[in-house]
Amino acid sequence: MASKYERILSDCRSKNVLWEDPDFPAVQSSVFYYQTPPFTFQWKRIMDLADSGSGAVAANSSAAPVFLNESAEFDVVPGKMGDRWLVSCLGLLSSLRNLFYRVVPADQTLASAHGVFRFRLWWCGEWVEVLVDDRLPTINGRLAFMQPQASNCFWAALLEKAIAKLHGSYEALKYGTRSDGLTDLLGGVVRQMPILSDNIRPQTLKELLTTTCIVTCLADKSATVAKKNLAERMPNGILVNVNYRLSSLDKVKTLMGDSVQLVCLKDTFSSKPFGEKTHFLGDWSPMSKTWERVSQVERARLIRQLGPGEFWLSFCDFVEIFSTMEVVYLDTETSNDEEMLKSRPLHWKMKMHQGQWKRGVTAGGCRNHESFHINPQLLISVQDEQDLVIALNQHTAVEPKVIGFTMYTWDGEYMLSECLQKDFFKNHVSYLNSDYGNTRHVSYHTHLEAGHYVLIPTTYEPAEEAHFTVRILGTGSFRLSCLETQTMILLDPFPALKSTDAERCGGPKVKSVCQYEPVYMQLADENKTINCFELHELLEACLPNDYIKGCANIDICRQVIALQDRSGSGRITFQQFKTFMVNLKSWQGVFKMYTKEKAGILRAERLRDALCDIGFQLSTDIMNCLIQRYIRKDGTLRLSDFVSAVIHLTTAFNQFHLKNYGQVNVIEVHLHDWIKSILSC
C-alpha cells in the first residue's frame, strides 16, 4: 500500500502541480500563533528565492539551490528569527551521517519533489513521518528563519519547517531546548550532566563511550548577540552554546616523561582535516607549541586518529572550557544504524510505556498530595544489578505541565500485580525522586540492584491532564509492566435492612425514615407501591434543604426503581424505600469524609477512594467511564452525582451476578439480555 507521501507525489506528478500543505498553510498563524508581529510574512518556494535574485539564498555562492549536498560543510545559521539551539542540534545530527539519513531521506531533490518533502522525527513515543511543502516564510525577500551561508543546501530550512509543523507554529520553537531537539532528531533519551557538580572524570567519559550513547559537551557561558546572528566564539575558538561531540580519549607521554589525558572532540560545523581551517586555537590545536612536548611518533599517532572536524584538547582544558555534557542514550535498534555505535560493547535495551494523566482517574499530582496513589504505577523488575536511565516525556509542546517521577522499592513476599494503595505511600520512604520541571522531558540515571521497583510518573499538581511516555534503558535484563487494580466488590454497597429493623423500624437511621410513612402512603397506589415520579415527590418533601436535596431528582429516582424492581412493574414498596433511604444516609456519611474542605463538593481525584469505602474496587478504565459520565466542568462532583454513580455501579454488579453461572468473572449472555442489562443501568 502506497504511503501518504507517495500518493501526494504521484498526484502532483499526474497534475503537474506543486503541492501545498493543507495542514500547515502559508499563513501568518503558522509562524506566530500567539503573538502578532508588526509585519507580514511572504511565503516563497525555494526555486523562487533563487530566481528573485534578492539575496534570499547565499549571496557568495554561484551554485544553484539544492536539497542536500553530501560533500558540503554544515553552514546553517538561524537567520533573523530562527533558534540557535535548533541549529546546534542539526549540526550534531549532520555529523552522524547514518542517523541523519533516518531523519532526512536522501532520495529527495528540489527538481523532482513537486514541492513535497518528507522527514522522520521522534514524536510522542514513536517515529513519525512529517510532510511539508517548500514554501518558506520571508521578510523583505529574505528567509526569516534557518538558512545556509554558502552551500545553498535547504534540507535544514525544510526540516525546521517540519519541526514547526509538529509544534503548531514557528513561534512554538522559541520555547524549545537542545534536549527537546536532540530527542526529536535522534530518538534517544537525553541526560544533562553539569561537568563540575557531577565531578566528571576521564573514567566517566570512557564508560560512556563503551555504550551506545552520543556524548556532547557545550560551553554555555552567557552569549551576546553576534553580528549576522552567528554563534559567538570564545577567544580559544570554541563556539558558545553549540554541541561538540566527544569522539574518543587517549593518553600521551611527553618528552619530560609525564602523561597528559587528552579528549577528542568533533566540531559539527567543520568537516576539514586537522590543521586545515581548524577553529580551536588552544593547546593541542594545529599551531600550538604544545606539540613540541611530544615526539614526532606520538604526534603522528594522535593526528592519525582524527577524523574531519576533530581536534584534541587536554582533559583539564575540557573541564574548564565546557560546563555541561548532554548525553543521548540510544536503544539497540536506533544505534545499529550508526557504525561507530554498533560496534560498542554495551547496548542499551529499551522498554516503553505510554499512558495518560486523566483528571479524577490517574492525575493525582506529586507525592505532596493525598491523591498521589491514583497516578499510573509502573513495576520495574530488575534481574541483574545494572545502570538504568529513566525518562519521562509529556506529549505537550506548548505550555507543558510541570512533571517528574518518584520510585519506591517493593520487597513484599508476593509478586506485585495490583496497584499499591494509599497506606503504602504513607508508610514508605521513596527510593529516588527526579527533579520536577515544566519541560517536555525529565530524565534520571541510577544504579539499581536486582529487585522490584514501582515508578510513579506524575504532574506536580493534581487534576492536570496530558499524555506521556516513560522509557527505561538498561544494559542488563529487566521488565516493565503497568500495575492495574482488579474490579471487584469489597463490601455490599446496598445492604438490605435486617428483618427486625424492617418490621419494627428499629435503629436510629430506620426510625428517621419511618417518619416519612404517612407521606409515602398518600402517594402510594392500592398495592402500597410508588413509581419514580411519586418517589421524586416524596424525596422533595422529605429531604432537608441542604446539599442532599440535590438527590431529589428524577434521574436518581429512575435509578432507584431500576435497582430494586425485580418484577418489571416500575414500582417499589415502602420497605424498599426505607432500604434506599438508610443506604443514602450511609453514602452521605462517606461523601462527607472526603469533602471536609468544602461541604457538598467532592474533588474528582477523591472519587476512587470514596467508592472504595462504599465497597467498590475499580480498574482505571471503569473509573475513566465513571468520571466522564459524572464529573462537572470544574472537576468536582456533588452528592447527587456521587449517589447516582453508586447506584449505577450497584445495578451493574447486580446484573452481572444474575448472569454469572459459576465461571469466575465471566458470563455468557444473549443479545436480548445484554441490551436489557445495559438499559437497566
Swiss-Prot record:
The EF-hand domain extends over 552-587
InterPro entries, A to Z: C2_III, Calpain_cysteine_protease, Calpain_domain_III, Calpain_III, Calpain_III_sf, EF-hand-dom_pair, EF_hand_dom, Papain-like_cys_pep_sf
Q: Where is the Calpain catalytic domain?
A: 18-331
Q: Primary place of residence?
A: cytoplasm
MF term (GO), any: calcium ion binding
Q: Where in the cell is it found?
A: Cytoplasm
State one Pfam family annotation: Peptidase_C2
- What are the start and end residues of every segment in region (Domain IV)? 515-681
Region called Linker, residue ranges? 482-514
| Additional remark text | Although strongly related to peptidase C2 proteins, it lack the essential Cys, His and Asn residues of the catalytic triad at positions 84, 242 and 267, respectively.
Annotated function: Not known; does not seem to have protease activity.
The UniProt entry's sequence similarity note says: Belongs to the peptidase C2 family.
PANTHER family in the cross-refs: CALPAIN, CALPAIN-C
Name assigned to this protein? Calpain-C
Which source organism does the UniProt entry give? Drosophila melanogaster (Fruit fly)
Write the lineage as a comma-separated list: Eukaryota, Metazoa, Ecdysozoa, Arthropoda, Hexapoda
State the encoding gene.
Answer: CalpC
